[in-house]
Amino acid sequence: MANTLEQLKPITTIVADTGDIEAIKRYQPEDATTNPSLILKASQIPEYSDLIENAINWAKSQSDDLEQQIEDAGDKLAVNIGLEILKIVPGRISTEVDARLSFDKTASIAKAHKLIQLYKEAGIDKSRILIKLASTWEGICAAKELEQEGINCNLTLLFSFAQARACAEAGVYLISPFVGRILDWYKKDTGLEYSAAEDPGVVSVTSIYNYYKRHGFNTVVMGASFRNTGEIIELAGCDRLTIGPALLEELSNSNTPIIQKLLPATETIAAQPAMSEAQFRWEFNEDPMAVEKLAEGIRNFAVDQGKLEVMLKAELSS
């Protein structure tokens, strides 16, 4: 019998949630996703020192201002890591916009254009890139404009149905609804343990998937942020699942049979009229878990971006 990972691949596109090139080579995913925390982690791998040096030298060639150099080096390093990953995966790389821009639509669009241009200068077409944005109202509005330009987006830090619905109505290419972080919140809030089938994160993604398929939305659902393989197995059949190296390893060493749990709708019905900003903000605000986890996620990504910039500043100043 094929291992669990190989059983999953025919029914769900497997994406590697890592910047570790060796892990990507090992598990042969279709796509890969990165974020500021993963870029920070990857920057500490000795084999990546040339990518950092290249980013530093490029940043110095672009400006004499240290703060601008730090920003440029961070963008170039994220793209350099993406370029290495694209040598391995046949599909796409997701590269994230600075989390500190999560409430600034105009700045998010400008950063997306800069990242796409850096990939273009390296010979990579935008069709192989997904721009990652936080699922704030401003991030969703930025994604709507980028999608209209033909730049596909991956809306991340998604914890609620309101966020998912707004993304679909904006014509976003892909969403990354989080599973494990939802489970974390409910376990802390209730003190309960949950089976994989009852896992609040699994229930959330299943609900979003079914809504999209029932209403004929083309937005891809890519479950993310897993705490265990049980969550992954319960979401077999989801459009895509982005999985970290430790759980990819566990799945490849397992022979648990896979049963497709998520199935496309046999017929579709018309969706409701699109949400207004006021409606989105109210419905999102009604979900304390989503409010807390989105804010926490943005803060944590911003902290890791800051740590990366401290490292880059030291390199630029040496």
UniProtKB/Swiss-Prot annotation:
Active-site residue numbers: 132
GO molecular-function terms, A-Z: transaldolase activity
First-tier enzyme category under EC: transferase
InterPro entries, per the entry: Aldolase_TIM, TAL/FSA, Transaldolase_1, Transaldolase_AS
GO BP field: carbohydrate metabolic process; pentose-phosphate shunt
Any one GO CC term of the record: cytosol
Function: Transaldolase is important for the balance of metabolites in the pentose-phosphate pathway.
Family: Belongs to the transaldolase family. Type 1 subfamily.
Name under which the protein is recorded: Transaldolase
Source organism (scientific name): Shewanella piezotolerans (strain WP3 / JCM 13877)
Lineage: Bacteria, Pseudomonadati, Pseudomonadota, Gammaproteobacteria, Alteromonadales
Name of the encoding gene: tal
